[in-house]
């Protein structure tokens, strides 16, 4: 314990500044334009060295301010800078002075990018509304590039990362059907599947 304290005290002012940054990772709740709740898909550094993240495009568009749900009192930590409505993804540029990117957020880890899951594979998601849930992969969705999975999703889970064996395979886009029951309790899988 003494060794740990000595190491921590030797870190200096830069470590103290880093500790003030908001930890953000896949599954973190985000607030867009002060009133829309969604979920961060993932976060990392792009080829230009910018700290960026992804969420669903229907959460907001370019220019929208993004705050961390867990630290709304700190104000905006990023801005939506690009997106694609057809593929339903948005790019967020984060302020590295305000955000500390993490690969594991609330116990949900993303260790890389994976291939499209096959029928029957178990996929898991972490959303700001319904938390963590896992379910079977049914197969391709109606729209190109989508997959249907039996994971729990509610409003606010849009953008939630979906993984197979801790590898990112997609994000929550919406519900498979408005004519089927929605997910009320993640432990009861009798609900409409999610479209990823």
Annotate each predicted stretch with a short phrase.
Residues 1-18:
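Secretory targeting and sorting signals
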Residues 16-30:
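Active-site-adjacent loops and short helices of periplasmic peptidoglycan-processing enzymes
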Residues 25, 32-141, 163-165, 169:
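Serine endopeptidase catalytic core focused on the charge-relay Asp
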Residues 84, 104, 149-155:
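Contiguous, well-folded functional domains in the mature portion of proteins
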Residues 88-91, 144-152:
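Short, solvent-exposed secondary-structure boundary/capping segments
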Residues 93-110, 174-196:
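C-terminal cap/linker of serine protease catalytic domains
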Residues 136, 146-148, 194-196:
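Mature hydrolase/peptidase catalytic cores and their serpin-fold inhibitory cores, especially
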Residues 152-172:
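Catalytic nucleophile loop of clan PA
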């Amino acid at each position: 314990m003494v060794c740990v304290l000595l190491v921590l005290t030797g870190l200096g002012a830069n470590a103290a500044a880093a500790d003030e940054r908001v930890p953000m990772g896949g599954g973190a709740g985000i607030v867009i334009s002060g009133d829309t709740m969604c979920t961060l898909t993932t976060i990392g550094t792009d080829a230009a060295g910018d700290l960026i993240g992804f969420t669903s495009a229907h959460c907001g568009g370019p220019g929208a301010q993004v705050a961390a749900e867990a630290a709304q009192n700190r104000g905006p930590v990023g801005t939506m800078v690009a997106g694609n409505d057809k593929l339903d993804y948005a790019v967020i540029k984060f302020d590295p002075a305000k955000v500390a990117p993490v690969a594991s957020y609330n116990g949900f880890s993303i260790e890389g990018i994976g291939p499209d899951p096959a029928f029957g594979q178990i996929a898991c998601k972490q959303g700001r509304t319904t938390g963590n849930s896992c379910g079977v992969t049914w197969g391709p969705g109606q729209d190109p590039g989508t997959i249907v999975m039996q994971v729990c999703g509610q409003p606010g889970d849009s953008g939630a990362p979906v993984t197979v064996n801790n590898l990112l395979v997609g994000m929550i886009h919406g519900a498979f059907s408005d004519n089927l029951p929605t997910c009320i309790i993640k432990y009861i899988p009798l609900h409409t599947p999610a479209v990823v």
